[in-house]
């Protein structure tokens, strides 16, 4: 009887080890992060000043646009939105509030621009 148990345990472990990568692969492929949209704001003319993040926050917040973060980056400002559906409205608001800036909406995975103004 001891011999039977010894043979069953390794086969159960082998089966578990064979199925584990498949389970991990399936769980990773089924998880998909929602698309994140960010607005990339750059000055219309090189060297022109951009407003600070608080000004941008005020303009978007007063219109009900939810913001994840506002980050300065290489003479530009990156605004990450909480809701991708609000990107069009946010782009329009910022294009009006910042007439001397270019506002580009991009997906976070680095694909081509969604809209530009």
From Swiss-Prot:
Q: How does it sit in the membrane?
A: Single-pass membrane protein
Per UniProt, which keywords does this protein have?
Answer: Cell inner membrane, Cell membrane, Membrane, Transmembrane, Transmembrane helix
UniProt xrefs under Pfam families? SecD-TM1
Residue intervals on the Cytoplasmic side: 1-11
Protein localization: Cell inner membrane
Which top-level group of life is the source organism from? Bacteria
* Principal location class: membrane
Parts of the chain that traverse the membrane: 12-29
Gene Ontology molecular-function annotations: protein kinase binding
NCBIfam families from the xrefs? PRK10629.1
The entry sums up its family as follows: Belongs to the MzrA family.
What HAMAP family does the record point to? Modulator_MzrA
UniProt-recorded name of the protein: Modulator protein MzrA
Tell me which species this is from.
Answer: Dickeya dadantii (strain 3937) (Erwinia chrysanthemi (strain 3937))
